[in-house]
């Protein structure tokens, strides 16, 4: 019984991801102190790149 719980724990931990949306473009955007948005950037912000594997926009404040 304890062994089956241990196997279930290992299976659960193997499928766990720390941050599944943090890809290279997202990390680069955040390191430049910009913000990631899924839709349009707020007013007074420029689009300077992408986030979330091209699905979002990296916004830089003017």
From Swiss-Prot:
Record keywords: Antibiotic, Antimicrobial, Defensin, Disulfide bond, Secreted, Signal
One GO cellular component term: extracellular region
Principal place of residence: secreted
Tissue expression pattern: Only expressed in epididymis (corpus and cauda).
InterPro entries reported for this sequence: Defensin_beta-like (IPR001855)
GO biological process: defense response to bacterium
Subcellular location: Secreted
Annotated function: Has antibacterial activity.
Protein name according to UniProt: Beta-defensin 37
Species the sequence originates in: Mus musculus
Gene behind this protein: Defb37
